[in-house]
């Protein structure tokens, strides 16, 4: 049964109804509409913690979607799933693919930085200072890019950049 027919959650149902209405009135081709339906079902499954189902829907949406911007969001959401399941290598790969398609996607830049920061912390805990500093520097570069695009976001990252001496004054303007 399609996910759209089994949403128990009021917000999910409301989103699904609105998305269906928008799909019907927007002048777009059937392939794009089908891609969006899979993307919507992927988001719903992801919100419910059904990651395998979400990935299946995202894969199908990716197969059908031609628009680079829309593809970037599909890849980004797939990256979120892999990151939450601890597969940081695959998450980074997907976030980078998303940025290749949409370079002004601050949330993907932020998540790349978060992964590098996490890896830096792990390297630091295992006593590898050089590796941890290199990973922290990578995190800093991606956070700076995200902050340049969305200067009012990522306050914790801005504070981390300042306290670790990795910020430059122009990064925030």
Swiss-Prot record:
Please report the record's description of how this protein sits within the membrane: Peripheral membrane protein
- Which InterPro entries does its entry note? PSI_Ycf3_assembly, TPR-like_helical_dom_sf, TPR_rpt, Ycf3/AcsC/BcsC/TPR_MFPF
Q: Where in the cell is it found?
A: Cellular thylakoid membrane
Where does the record locate the signal sequence feature? none
Family annotation (PROSITE patterns): TPR, TPR_REGION
Going by the UniProt record, its keywords in alphabetical order are: Membrane, Photosynthesis, Repeat, Thylakoid, TPR repeat
Record's GO cellular component terms: plasma membrane-derived thylakoid membrane
Presence of the UniProt keyword Thylakoid in the record: yes
Mark the TPR repeats by their residue spans: 35-68, 72-105, 120-153
Q: Name one GO biological process term.
A: photosynthesis
**What Pfam families does UniProt report for this protein, alphabetically?**
TPR_1, TPR_7
Q: Which HAMAP family is this protein grouped with?
A: Ycf3
PANTHER family, from UniProt?
CELLULOSE SYNTHASE OPERON PROTEIN C, TPR REPEAT-CONTAINING PROTEIN MJ0263
Q: What does this protein do?
A: Essential for the assembly of the photosystem I (PSI) complex. May act as a chaperone-like factor to guide the assembly of the PSI subunits.
**NCBIfam families in the record:** PRK02603.1
Q: Which family does it belong to?
A: Belongs to the Ycf3 family.
Q: What is this protein called?
A: Photosystem I assembly protein Ycf3
Q: Which organism is it from?
A: Picosynechococcus sp. (strain ATCC 27264 / PCC 7002 / PR-6)
Name the encoding gene, please: ycf3
